[in-house]
């Protein structure tokens, strides 16, 4: 035990030793860490033994819940059998081969039979980095070196590396990092409640979004636009559900101009929406799919990049001339991670957790609508499956948000944590996300509703004081 731990404990050791991701340094030094000591199912415990109902699912990722002995055993056996080997230079091993085959089977079963090959990484960010590079590689191999630009969307979250952070459409992730890179274009956020014009119907809003995308393609030249990247439902941005018809119309535009579609399913994949993948939910036919989080339920860092037969054919045909695909990571297809993923997928299937996400998601959303939708500071309750948000509004009738600096949703999130409920405030709009493990029960949904109602009531006096602090109408 270090002298620091003996003298001060974990709280001070944390402040002295850790640089936390996505954390205010000055606030952290004042208040210290929020330490979690254990987890089981949907429940976390802090060092004092206090229980916290985790309706954030870690970071949208603990799909099968905490403390699964089957996954611990899978990790143990994999470590004992083959603790590591790589996939470079035609090397392989059974766990990676079997996982790739199983993932393709899951997608094909859902109708995405055009997906052909699997590449492994370690995080959602690097999966989108891989997509970024493959788009360039693909068009270079086709003799189209000018076709490199990627369209993303305001409010999107695609990661924090230089490439994936550029694709992210939230300004806070760009500030002081000299992002985004040239060649990344952000179009309007498809969130009707917040961004529709006064009197604009959802159909008219969708028209405007598609017209804007077509105008960007015309302005930049379709010969320069390589891909469009989209989360089927935008997670970190605030659980932003697209307007009806958005994706069918978008795909038609992209097809017309030979533009690839990258589906970022890092959050939506592996049952979160009540279907295995959002490609099935929205009838998407993406050329690249980025996955992570739920593939191992965060028991091991692993990501997946699926590519279409269309892309594979170009790579295969060019191989004699260009040589190896010079992209990969030491831990691509790690045998321990792949072994955990295979058991994790079996748990999702055997316990019916995808169907449970659909059923419990509908129950939780209905409960939120019934119990808080009429609250004067709740603008909208929305979502699909176990991906739900409550958006706050200073003036719900006119859809006027609280001033960003006021942090109204963070106040509610902090009150929720005090009451024993963990939910996540968005860094883009004043929305609170509910994304519990897919094993959540009806009783746990009821408890989360009770805790949230109590937290919102406790926060209301502060929201009253802030309601005069509004963003411009």
Show the residue positions of the predicted features.
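Conserved N-terminal phosphate-binding loop of PLP-dependent enzymes in the Aspartate aminotransferase
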Residues: 2-473
């Amino acid at each position: 035990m270090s002298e620091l731990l003996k003298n001060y404990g974990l709280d001070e050791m944390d402040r002295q030793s850790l640089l936390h991701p996505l954390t205010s340094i000055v606030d952290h030094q004042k208040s210290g860490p929020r330490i979690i000591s254990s987890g089981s199912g949907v429940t976390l415990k802090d060092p004092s033994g206090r229980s916290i109902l985790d309706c954030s699912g870690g970071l949208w990722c603990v799909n099968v819940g905490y403390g699964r002995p089957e996954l611990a055993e899978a990790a143990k056996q994999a470590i004992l059998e083959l603790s590591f080997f790589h996939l470079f230079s035609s090397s392989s091993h059974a766990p990676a081969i079997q996982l790739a085959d199983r993932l393709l089977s899951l997608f094909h079963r859902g109708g995405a039979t055009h997906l052909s090959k699997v590449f492994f990484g370690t995080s959602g960010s690097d999966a989108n980095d891989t997509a970024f590079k493959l788009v360039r590689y693909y068009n270079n191999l086709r003799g189209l070196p000018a076709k490199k630009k990627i369209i993303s969307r305001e409010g999107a979250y695609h990661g924090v590396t230089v490439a994936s952070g550029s694709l992210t459409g939230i300004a806070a992730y760009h500030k002081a990092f000299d992002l985004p890179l040239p060649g990344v274009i952000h179009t309007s956020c498809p969130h009707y409640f917040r961004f529709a014009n006064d009197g604009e119907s959802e159909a008219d809003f969708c028209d405007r979004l598609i017209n804007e995308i077509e105008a960007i393609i015309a302005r930049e030249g379709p010969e320069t636009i390589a891909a469009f990247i989209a989360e089927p439902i935008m997670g970190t941005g605030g659980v932003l559900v697209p307007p009806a018809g958005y994706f069918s119309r978008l795909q038609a535009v992209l097809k017309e101009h030979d533009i690839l579609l990258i589906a970022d399913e890092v959050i939506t994949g592996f049952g979160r929406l009540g279907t295995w993948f959002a490609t099935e939910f929205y009838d998407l036919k993406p050329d690249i799919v980025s996955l992570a989080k739920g593939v191992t339920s965060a028991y091991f860092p692993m990501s997946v990049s699926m590519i279409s037969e269309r892309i594979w054919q170009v790579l295969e045909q060019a191989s004699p001339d260009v040589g190896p695909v010079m992209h990969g990571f030491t831990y691509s297809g790690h045998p321990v991670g792949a072994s955990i993923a295979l058991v994790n997928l079996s748990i999702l299937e055997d316990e019916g957790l995808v169907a449970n996400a659909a059923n419990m998601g509908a129950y939780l959303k209905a409960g939120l609508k019934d119990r808080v939708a009429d609250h004067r500071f709740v603008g909208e309750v929305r979502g699909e499956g176990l991906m739900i948000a409550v958006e706050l509004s200073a003036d719900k009738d006119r859809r006027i948000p609280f001033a960003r600096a006021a942090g109204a949703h963070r106040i509610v999130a902090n009150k929720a944590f005090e009451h024993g409920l963990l939910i996540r405030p968005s860094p883009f709009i004043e929305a609170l996300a509910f994304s519990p493990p897919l094993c959540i029960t009806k009783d746990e949904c009821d408890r989360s509703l009770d805790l949230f109602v109590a937290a919102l009531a406790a926060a209301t006096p502060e929201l009253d004081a802030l309601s005069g602090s509004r963003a411009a109408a």
